[in-house]
Amino acid sequence: RVFAPSEDKFEEVDTGNSERSLRYRRAYQVAKGAVGPQVGTVRRKLERVMMSQAQTFWEGGKRSGRLDVRRNSKKIVELRPDVFRRRQEESAVNTALSILVDMSGSMSSSKIFMAQRATIAICEALDGMRVPLEVLGHHTAASSAMQDAWYRLPQDRRKMVSRVQSIDMHLFKGFDEPLSMARAKLGRMTQMTDGANADGDAIVMAAKRLMARREPRKVMLVLSDGEPAYTGYNRNIHNHTRDCVKWVGENGIEIAGLGIMSASVTKYYDRVVVVNKIEDFATTYIDEVAKLLTGRSLST
């Protein structure tokens, strides 16, 4: 059957039984170890920037804390319990972050390992900073039956089909999911590359989830090794990808492309970082993430 939008799939990554889950957790730890030195440095830098922007205030009417004599002298005389105040800190980063990883066949081998490590570096650096973070991966589903059905269509009807393959969207970590619960799923990422990449449609799918968040600032990072590639007819897939990126921006999402050993992302995104080796994380990649989250460079 020729593709219909309802055939796109959204599924949480399955880590299987306890033995497989343990194996994926070990894979995560290996990847984390590869970026460990950078993660520690980046976390300290991010914390410094965020703390400098945080707003601190005192909230009264508490039953414990510091005695608020100035505002509650009458209540103190009356022996009321709500005469204390507590120091509250409002996070400087009221931002939700979505990371979308191209997991097509061309990303196999060293590229998906680098994408996994880049993703883990961000997850670990932001862990504990109260930044809602979602990690998604996408590729098309290979189906010879759908492809054959498309080719059997009359030429005029074939031109009406913009995309033959459906999209498989994998959830590695939810916005409100603790990182500790997602590590096994992220550890499996390197084993899941397949098919092609319908970047534009996948970006829109991820963006709609991000748009549902209540945080005033929304940021999306798209990790990819190249250009979109999938079967279709009535669509210029390159222009379509650019149109989707533009639509995301018009709907209040700041979007950036991270090129994995490729500069092709420069064709589709205004904000771009190209990473060719793991050592680039602590400079180019992480600094761009910091600027997106805080509006400031880590070097400031």
Question: What is each PLM-predicted segment?
Answer:
Residues 1-300:
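Acidic, glycine-rich A-domain
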